[in-house]
């Protein structure tokens, strides 16, 4: 079999091409865990990323870990002024957004009915619901047709876990946003939701071993997920691999929601 040099070059080009080559991504709440893993993978796949975080020290550390093609912008997704500053920086530096991953979130676990406070409720909905909505709304002027919006939900919005009333409701609202925005942006920008199950991140660090074992016991795969596994799902939704996918809820939960 004789293969021309041009065919070899074409094959090598396709096999070595990166899924997010020359794309601009914004990832909120990306100083640790799933969002940081996603930022790293996006850069590996050719993207330039803007990441946000509330604490400057953690943000600086994340930028250093990512290593290249990244700008860190200190800010709180629940504060409108911080969002305005974020997107002004993105506009000034890159002029556009190809991928938006609204990942910033907040939640108190282990808060059953009777122990919920007004502050806990307000803080959770301010970041998870209000923050998600205005993150997307303020990003839209910089997004072009063909762009991808990814929202971060949670298995808690699908299943009924004791002690998660407020957090679960906030994440169910995120799922609802995706349905509505898919209808509003149809044919232009894709909107999808990633719904992680129990992932081995700092969010679960404050739980007792008994509580952790309880979560793992209901996962058919018998383990917590890894941040990189969420990143891989985000890469799929960000890239052209999902060009005909919009409005979905991609459950990355080891099968928890199915049993």
Language-model segments: which ranges?
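Residue(s) in the substrate-gating loop at a strand-loop-helix junction
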Residues: 154
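Conserved glycine-rich cofactor-binding loop
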Residues: 24, 31-32
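A short, exposed helix-loop element centered on a Lys and neighboring polar residues
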Residues: 136-137, 179
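Alpha-helical segment proximal to the catalytic Tyr-Lys
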Residues: 141, 182-187, 243
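Catalytic Tyr-X3-Lys loop
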Residues: 114-134, 150, 170, 174
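Substrate-binding pocket helix/loop in short-chain dehydrogenase/reductase
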Residues: 111-113, 117-125, 204, 211, ...
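Short C-terminal tail/terminal secondary-structure segment
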Residues: 7, 11, 15, 107-110, ...
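C-terminal substrate-recognition "lid" of short-chain dehydrogenase/reductases
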Residues: 142, 223-252, 257-258
């Amino acid at each position: 079999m004789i293969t021309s040099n041009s065919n070899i070059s074409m094959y090598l080009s396709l096999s070595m091409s990166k899924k997010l080559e020359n794309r601009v991504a914004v990832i909120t709440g990306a100083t640790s865990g799933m969002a940081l893993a996603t930022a790293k993978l996006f850069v590996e796949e050719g993207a330039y990323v803007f990441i946000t975080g509330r604490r400057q020290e953690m943000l600086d550390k994340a930028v250093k870990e990512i290593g290249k093609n990244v700008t860190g912008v200190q800010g709180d997704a629940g504060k409108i002024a911080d969002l305005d500053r974020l997107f002004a920086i993105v506009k000034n530096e890159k002029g556009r957004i190809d991928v938006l991953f609204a990942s910033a979130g907040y939640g108190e676990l282990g808060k059953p009915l009777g122990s919920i406070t007004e502050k806990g409720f307000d803080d959770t909905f301010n970041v998870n619901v209000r923050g998600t909505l205005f993150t997307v709304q303020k990003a839209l002027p910089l997004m072009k047709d063909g762009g991808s919006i990814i929202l971060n939900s949670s298995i808690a919005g699908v299943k009924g876990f004791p002690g998660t009333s407020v957090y679960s409701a906030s994440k169910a609202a995120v799922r609802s946003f995706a349905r509505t925005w898919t209808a509003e942006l149809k044919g232009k920008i894709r909107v999808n939701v990633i719904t992680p199950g129990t992932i081995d991140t700092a969010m679960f660090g404050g739980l007792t071993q008994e509580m952790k074992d309880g979560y793992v016991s209901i996962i058919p795969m018998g383990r917590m997920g890894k941040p990189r596994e969420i990143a891989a799902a985000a890469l799929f939704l960000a890239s052209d691999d999902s060009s005909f996918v919009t409005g979905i809820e991609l459950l990355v939960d080891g099968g928890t929601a199915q049993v």
